[in-house]
Amino acid sequence: YPLGHQMRFLALSEEDPSSLLGKTYINSNADVIKLFSDDSDVVTYESENTDVSIVRDVSKKSNVFPSERSLHLTQHRGREKELLCELNIPCAPYQIVNSVSELQNAIKSIGLPAILKTTRDGYDGKGQFHIKSESQIDEAWGHMSGNESILEGFVKFERELSLIAVRGLDGSLKYYPLVENTHHEGILRLTVAPAQNISKSLQKKAEGYMHSLINEI
């Protein structure tokens, strides 16, 4: 077993590739979740689109990382932005919209060009619409299928950098060096690690933001 650990998986289908790596529990009903939880000491999940109720149920029996609250925050773009603002971490101007009229008002406030995104489930450029002119408002809202969305303004930037951090059970934090990401058509195509030409002050600034964020969630 990798690192001496026995792996267990909770999946929706018997065809899930996790079945090649360890015992797999199929379905997400209460009985299966209980069996999975009873058989697991520590649990983590693959993506922010995981059902919060499943994480809540598993947490009753097992240690789950990241926490249920972390999942609740990160699977909704509006809640993410609100938290960043509360922690004084800079982010693009934004506004939640639930109708064409709200989108029109948001554009008046934020300006164009801007990006309209679904508040949930979007990834790799999916669930997004680049609005360049007011003539595209109806088309953009139709692209969202009437779902709650978030309008984000553009910001000028030189490059995109990411930081990964880990926290121990004792609360200690460790940070990886910053990495540089390159996207094409909304999809991450290349990550260079470590990023080049990074000053110590920039690394420390990113670590400061991460410290505030990770201790909050």
Model segments located where?
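A conserved helix-loop-beta module that forms one wall/lid of the active-site cleft
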Residues: 67-127, 134
